[in-house]
């Protein structure tokens, strides 16, 4: 019996050569089905979950753990120190210790394999019962995930040790069990030398966070099954190769049966001990090799995830089944040919995303419902692939990917991003065993999943001979799949795929360590013929994904550019509460973790509760499988629907169309579509339209599900498009001016000066101008104030994450947009009105104000405002802007106003309608998915509450805006907010924001793009920068009648 003190003295958690003791080697998951029916339907596995309430006590270090951890009973004094904790869970989210978020840097001094002596250690105790029938069999305890290392005892006897937080730790405890109650005790150590291999841009959380189970198998049992289905060269017929490892002292047979549903397709029984394979070391009497021939099976792809079921049985001489395992089988080939990645002979386009296992409350302890929610959202938003960034996922995840249809890059739990150099441990032979175990154990566990089409050696740990060894082993063990690895430059000898990070479409990125060529350039490098699939791209941090459509244009134009994986799926925010009880999503530093990387974990397509960021709609649109083009004829339109599906027919889709006139629907229809893979169908649309002179016409297209499917309900929108229609009226709208003079005379436009105020009155409106400030300070319409603040120039936006880059509060990046803007004082310029002139004509009043802007005693900008108020009480503002040559590209060119905040009973005033792009937030470089129309939303819904507050809510290409009784006409972008830019700029969380007593309205002539190729360098493309020094624009305001 090994005491706690003896185990602690071994110091295994600081020895890179010791990453396990007594752990069972990797193998396919065990189920031990008793009946064929159970095997076919994955029911009643001989697997007993030990999840639930366990006893728990946290110590500051392993050395503090008492021997009473192993005691059968605890004294009252000892028992008082223990509480209960739910398993699985992360103890930091149950009130113990604190979460830490880091991206690159380690949360402890870097001195491998040494970790801090202050090393939180969680001790767990539980009991479980075993029957006499179980005692006669083989019993293994399996911990699916423990962070980061742990020692285990059963009934006071030492069991073993394990590292690798993301793979099963399985131990044979058959000889330690007794009939009736049995005791388990685990000592879980937060920091181990294994932590140096798990520096993965996520929260550092600890504990038993995945399932714990007892698996009971016969003494003579199936140990491992490797199923390899292979289609022939014509992708018609197939073979299924099955390698079965058995633990049997008696003469046994192995039977394999392939089922399609409950129907047997083919089967075979082989005598195990007479089917030896011989190599230089002799025969393999514990391994049986079998092959099944299958005629014209249905294929598995992400589009058509058809599954068969193979049942493997261990049979004794009497014909009795001793043990039985079963696995899903998908017939698909993965090949590398002519510089492309092929699935079943077709070059796939990876519509992928990187996904961390994360829950806003439970942290890393996710369950099947959480996984299923993600699977359905991925399918609903046109994703076909997932990279398990950056570790093997929960085993149920792969089963769901098999069932629902997602391609998977399965990634080993290895990242040493914070090491310098990054590849230091990858070149150290002391760490080679740990590297190899993490990779091989993953492959052994997951090898039978058809969804896994690529193995990944890990992430961001440089390149060394260990990677070459891992690559060589993978190609030998499983030649049916390619291997990818980005480390060392994305194109080393250890990868079959060029897998760069954040490479741009046309621009090379300077990098001191490794080159980051433009993806188009990578294709043309001498001697290079591998496909390019971005393992990470389009960094979705906050308000991001600008120019995402440029990637997809390139992917579709260049056959060897085969897509990529967006970073990343979900914001890794954790739910926290203010002192007053208000919930908000926390990021690095919010739990007292002083060494952190702030909000760099907030870079998902979804908020932590799985509601979408606006940029998810852009990704969905760019990745959709159908495209549309229109040919006009005399009395109808021919709509061509082209399919990019490689394998499936559109047999469950309805095409709904709608004609818009000036943004409003006037006629609509629908029809089913049946498009073959990579083919097109023409649909005739013959709407009766009475075209009006000067009107704008658009055709909206939605392709929706006709019936429910596994991942969405009927009516779910899959693909969208908007096509402009030519106005066939051929007429120019006629505007009569015959009665203008009389109307003006009757309206009585008057100008009156009162001290420093100029009052312009017309109809039921009074406009007040300050003759010193040059600003419109008040607008009364029927005695109601329209403005809460003057109209004025606006050049500032609350910086986005992409504007801030890698800047820290005390260490700003001088190249970041935010730093350039702050050096230029944008948002803090001193304004001086140099003149105000009034001109009254027969039809209107014109007030001209000239402004100068100074910063640090330097003239930095000048603007000219011409306010024109006509006889209809319409206010037209014409603005000229002149910027100093020293200024950087501007965040925006426009004006701002404020209107009274609506009261809760003023429902109509709480809604905003506009004619322009929408309905969701869109920016000049992220608007491909938005559609022109007349949209209406509440003021609250027009805002996007990013976890780290920034500018948000823009709507582009607008012609009209109606808000709070005010109408704006022109050509502009706009946003509406309950929070001013200063508040958005200074707030760190949504809980910091307090609605003000007005609603801010921002009208932009030009607004800089959001960027998003990455978030640490200026990534807004040149076409979406505001670089000119002179601008002129106009908008017209009027009271909405």
From Swiss-Prot:
Name the source's superkingdom: Bacteria
Per UniProt, substrate binds at 103, 201, 460, 536-539, 603, 1016
| UniProt-annotated binding residues for Mg(2+) 1 | 415, 417, 460
**Which EC class is this protein assigned?**
hydrolase
User: What molecular function terms (GO) are annotated for this protein?
Assistant: beta-galactosidase activity; carbohydrate binding; magnesium ion binding
EC annotation? 3.2.1.23
- Give residues annotated as binding Na(+): 201, 600, 603
Name a GO CC annotation attached to this entry: beta-galactosidase complex
List site positions: Transition state stabilizer: 356, 390
PANTHER family (alphabetical): BETA-GALACTOSIDASE
Q: What is this protein called?
A: Beta-galactosidase
The root-end lineage is: Bacteria, Pseudomonadati, Pseudomonadota, Gammaproteobacteria, Alteromonadales
């Amino acid at each position: 019996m090994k005491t706690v003190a003896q185990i602690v003295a071994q110091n295994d958690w600081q020895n890179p050569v010791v990453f396990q003791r007594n752990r069972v080697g990797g193998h396919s998951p065990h189920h031990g089905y008793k009946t064929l029916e159970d095997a076919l339907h994955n029911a009643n596995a001989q697997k007993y979950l030990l999840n639930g309430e366990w006893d728990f006590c946290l110590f500051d270090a392993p050395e503090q753990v008492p021997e009473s951890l192993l005691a059968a009973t605890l004294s009252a004094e000892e028992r008082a120190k223990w509480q209960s904790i739910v398993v699985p869970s992360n103890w930091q989210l149950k009130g113990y210790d604190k979460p830490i978020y880091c991206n690159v840097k380690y949360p402890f001094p870097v001195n491998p394999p040494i970790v801090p002596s202050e090393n939180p250690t969680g001790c767990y105790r539980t009991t479980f019962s075993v029957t006499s029938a179980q005692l006669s069999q083989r019993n293994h305890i399996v911990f699916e995930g423990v962070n980061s290392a742990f020692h285990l005892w059963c009934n006071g006897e030492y069991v073993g040790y394990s590292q690798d937080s993301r793979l099963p730790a399985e131990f044979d405890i058959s000889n330690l069990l007794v009939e009736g109650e049995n005791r388990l005790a685990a000592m879980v150590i937060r920091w181990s030398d294994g932590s140096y291999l798990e520096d993965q841009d996520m929260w550092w959380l600890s504990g038993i966070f995945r399932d714990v189970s007892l698996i009971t198998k016969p003494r003579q049992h199936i140990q491992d099954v490797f199923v390899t289905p292979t289609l022939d060269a014509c992708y018609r017929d197939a073979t299924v190769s099955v390698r079965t490892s058995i633990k049997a002292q008696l003469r046994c047979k192995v039977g394999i049966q392939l089922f399609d549903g409950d129907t047997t397709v083919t089967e075979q029984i082989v005598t195990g001990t007479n089917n030896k394979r011989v190599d230089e070391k002799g025969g393999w009497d514990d391994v049986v090799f079998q092959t099944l021939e299958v005629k014209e099976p249905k294929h598995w792809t992400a589009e058509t995830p058809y599954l068969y079921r193979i049942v493997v049985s261990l049979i004794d001489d009497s014909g009795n089944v001793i043990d039985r395992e079963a696995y899903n089988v998908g017939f698909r080939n993965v090949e590398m040919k002519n510089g492309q990645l092929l699935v079943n002979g077709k070059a796939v386009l990876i519509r992928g995303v990187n996904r961390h296992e994360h829950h806003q409350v439970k942290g890393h302890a996710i369950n099947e419902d959480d996984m299923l929610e993600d699977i359905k959202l991925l399918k609903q938003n046109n994703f076909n692939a997932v990279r398990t960034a950056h570790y093997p996922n929960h085993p149920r995840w792969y089963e769901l990917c098999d069932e629902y249809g997602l391609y998977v890059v399965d990634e080993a739990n290895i990242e040493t991003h914070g090491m310098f150099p990054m590849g230091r441990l990858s070149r150290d032979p002391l760490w080679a065993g740990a590297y190899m175990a993490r990779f091989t154990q993953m492959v052994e566990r997951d090898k039978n999943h058809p969804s896994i089409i690529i193995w990944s050696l890990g992430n961001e740990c440089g390149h060394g001979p260990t990677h070459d060894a891992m690559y060589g082993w993978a190609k030998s063990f499983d030649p049916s799949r390619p291997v990818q690895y980005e480390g060392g430059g994305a194109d080393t000898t250890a990868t079959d795929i060029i897998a760069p990070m954040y490479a741009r479409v046309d621009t090379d990125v300077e990098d001191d360590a490794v080159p980051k060529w433009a993806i188009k350039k990578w294709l043309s490098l001498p001697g290079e013929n591998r496909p390019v699939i971005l393992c990470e791209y389009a960094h979705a941090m906050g308000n991001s994904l600008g120019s995402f459509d440029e990637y997809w244009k390139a992917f579709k134009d260049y056959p060897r550019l085969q897509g990529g994986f967006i970073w990343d799926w979900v914001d890794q925010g954790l739910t926290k509460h203010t002192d007053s009880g208000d919930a908000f999503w926390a990021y690095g530093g919010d739990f007292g973790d002083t060494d952190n990387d702030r909000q760099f974990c907030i870079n998902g397509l979804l908020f932590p509760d799985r509601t979408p960021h606006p940029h998810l709609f852009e990704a969905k649109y760019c990745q959709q499988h159908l495209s549309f083009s229109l040919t006009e004829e005399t009395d109808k339109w021919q709509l061509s629907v082209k399919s990019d599906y490689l394998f499936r027919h559109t047999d469950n889709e309805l095409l709904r169309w709608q004609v818009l006139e000036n943004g409003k629907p006037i006629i609509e229809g629908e029809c089913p579509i049946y498009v073959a893979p990579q083919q097109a169908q023409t649909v005739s649309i013959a709407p009766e339209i009475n075209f009006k002179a000067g009107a704008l016409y658009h055709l909206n297209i939605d392709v929706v599900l006709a019936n429910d499917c596994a991942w969405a309900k009927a009516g779910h929108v899959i693909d969208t498009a908007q096509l402009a229609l030519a106005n066939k009226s051929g007429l120019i709208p006629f505007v009569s001016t015959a009665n203008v003079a009389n109307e003006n005379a009757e309206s009585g436009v008057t100008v009156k000066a009162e001290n420093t105020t100029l009052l312009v009155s017309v109809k039921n409106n009074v406009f007040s101008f300050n003759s010193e400030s040059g600003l419109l300070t008040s607008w009364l319409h029927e005695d109601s104030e329209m403005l809460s603040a003057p109209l004025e120039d606006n050049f500032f936006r609350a910086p986005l994450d992409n504007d801030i880059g890698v800047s820290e509060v005390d260490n700003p990046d001088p190249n970041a947009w935010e730093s350039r803007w702050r050096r230029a004082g944008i948002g803090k310029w001193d304004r001086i009105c140099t003149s105000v002139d009034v001109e009254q004509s027969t039809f209107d009043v014109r007030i001209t104000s000239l402004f100068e802007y100074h910063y640090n005693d330097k003239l930095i900008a000048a603007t000219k405002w011409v306010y024109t108020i006509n006889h209809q009480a319409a206010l037209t503002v014409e603005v000229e802007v002149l910027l100093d040559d020293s200024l950087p590209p501007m965040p925006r060119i426009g004006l701002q106003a404020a209107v009274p905040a609506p009261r809760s009973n003023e429902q109509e005033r709480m809604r905003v309608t506009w004619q322009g792009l929408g309905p969701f937030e869109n920016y000049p470089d992220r608007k491909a998915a938005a559609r022109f129309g007349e949209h209406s939303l509440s003021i609250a819904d027009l805002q996007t509450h990013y976890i780290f507050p920034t500018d948000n809510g823009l709507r582009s290409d607008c012609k009209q805006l109606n808000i709070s009784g005010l109408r704006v006409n022109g050509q502009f972008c706009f946003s509406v907010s309950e929070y001013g830019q200063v508040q958005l700029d200074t707030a760190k969380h949504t809980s910091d924001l307090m609605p003000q007593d007005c609603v801010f309205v921002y009208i932009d002539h030009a607004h800089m793009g959001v960027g998003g190729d990455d978030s640490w360098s200026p990534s807004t493309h040149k076409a979406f920068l505001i670089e000119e020094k002179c601008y002129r624009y106009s908008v017209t305001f009027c009271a909405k009648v």
